[in-house]
Swiss-Prot record:
Protein name as annotated: Aspartyl/glutamyl-tRNA(Asn/Gln) amidotransferase subunit C
GO annotation, biological process: glutaminyl-tRNAGln biosynthesis via transamidation; regulation of translational fidelity; translation
Subunit structure: Heterotrimer of A, B and C subunits.
Keywords, in A-Z order: ATP-binding, Ligase, Nucleotide-binding, Protein biosynthesis
Swiss-Prot/TrEMBL catalytic activity: L-glutamyl-tRNA(Gln) + L-glutamine + ATP + H2O = L-glutaminyl-tRNA(Gln) + L-glutamate + ADP + phosphate + H(+); L-aspartyl-tRNA(Asn) + L-glutamine + ATP + H2O = L-asparaginyl-tRNA(Asn) + L-glutamate + ADP + phosphate + 2 H(+)
GO molecular function: asparaginyl-tRNA synthase (glutamine-hydrolyzing) activity; ATP binding; glutaminyl-tRNA synthase (glutamine-hydrolyzing) activity
Pfam families cross-referenced by the UniProt entry: GatC
Claim: Nucleotide-binding is one of the keywords in the record: yes
């Protein structure tokens, strides 16, 4: 899927970006290179290959050091709200800003 200069200018307009002609041409080359890489990756036959959550796990010398998913913090709402000038039902009371 190759983009044209018109496509790049239209995308820039939709994104509310102002691109000079030189910038648009440079962006066109970069985007087409990117889409070419994506097409190459899509052409690879991955039948029978399980997806990896962490590709680095396939390297034998490196072990993932993931911590246990445990609660390590406690709720300290009362301690944090103690110095507040006004609190009600666990919420901070502030002056009305918008009328």
């Amino acid at each position: 899927m190759a983009l044209t200069l018109t496509d790049v200018k239209r995308i820039a307009h939709l994104a509310r970006l102002e691109l000079a002609d030189a910038e648009a041409e440079h962006t066109l080359v970069q985007l087409n290179d990117f889409f070419g890489l994506v097409e190459q990756m899509q052409a690879v036959d991955t039948t029978g290959i399980a997806p990896l959550a962490h590709p680095i796990e396939q390297i034998e010398d490196v072990a993932l050091r993931l911590r246990d998913d445990t609660v390590t913090e406690t709720v300290e709402r009362e301690a944090f709200q103690r110095p507040a000038p006004a609190v009600q039902d666990g919420l901070y009371l502030v002056p009305k800003v918008i009328e």
